[in-house]
Amino acid sequence: MQGKYVIAYDLGTGGLKASLHDASGTTLAFLVCEYPTLYYKEVFHEQRPEDWWQAICRSTRLLLDKVKEQNICKEQICALAISGHSLVGIPMDREGRPLVGQVPIWSDGRAKEQARRFFETHDYNAW
């Protein structure tokens, strides 16, 4: 079992981009798993964390399937790199289960007025 590999995940507005890389940084496989963004009441923009998780699980299986002929297996994955579109908290219970089914994402407009007031006293470029 030679080689160590990294899987990178990028949680975006329209879906998850996932890629598998070797130690030199060469991309060996890439794919996108789409999930919905829920838009309602004009300013509400939300996603379901469960959709994110399912996309990560599905993309991992698909990536490993794509490189199966290169004899790359899950035991050779040494690291995960994860980035996302939002600085969002997901409230969890003591057992690690989400307390809400949907969370706001970066484009949600409900706090527009609060943001405006914040930047009246804080430099936007310094933020």
Where are these regions (language model features)?
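Glycine-rich phosphate-binding loop plus the immediately following alpha-helix
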Residues: 106-127
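N-terminal glycine/serine-rich phosphate-binding loop of ATP-dependent small-molecule kinases
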Residues: 1-101, 113, 117
